[in-house]
Amino acid sequence: MLCPFCNHGELKVIDSRNAPESNAIKRRRECLRCSQRFTTFETVELTVQVLKRDGRYENFQESKLVNGLKAASSHTRIGQEQVQAIASNIKQDLLGKQNREISTKEIGELVMKYLKKADMIAYIRFACVYRRFKDVGELMEVLLSATPDGEKQT
């Protein structure tokens, strides 16, 4: 790592702490040449291959997950912080798997699990895009499963 101020390569770590809100390690560093101090965050790199519907493999991209969550939760009570928290939870679930290969179907099911707990409108919006309903009957099944005992919610 280079100092962002003078590009010198010799740094010393002054302080190191867990940053639990972002599953990262926060480090305070000092450049040994210019004595400037700065903060860095270290996170685990997720090396998971995603199997796409067409059979291709692609590296997992958290930004795609966050964008999908944002689209589903637009104009709902889910805020940016909760979107990030859900994405972080899903990422942790993926890291916990033994297999470093996951299908888009498995990722979609994880998203649905977390959105169902967070906000029903976001859950249904995501389900409409993710499940690619062919008719209204399929949508009705999701709507009925989203409410307790299939009852109407007001």
Swiss-Prot record:
One of its GO terms (molecular function) is zinc ion binding. Negatively regulates transcription of bacterial ribonucleotide reductase nrd genes and operons by binding to NrdR-boxes. NCBIfam families: transcriptional regulator NrdR. This is Transcriptional repressor NrdR. Keywords: ATP-binding, DNA-binding, Metal-binding, Nucleotide-binding, Repressor, Transcription, Transcription regulation, Zinc, Zinc-finger. The keyword Protein transport does not apply. It comes from Chlamydia trachomatis serovar D (strain ATCC VR-885 / DSM 19411 / UW-3/Cx). InterPro entries: ATP-cone_dom, NrdR-like_N, RNR_NrdR-like. GO terms for biological process: negative regulation of DNA-templated transcription.
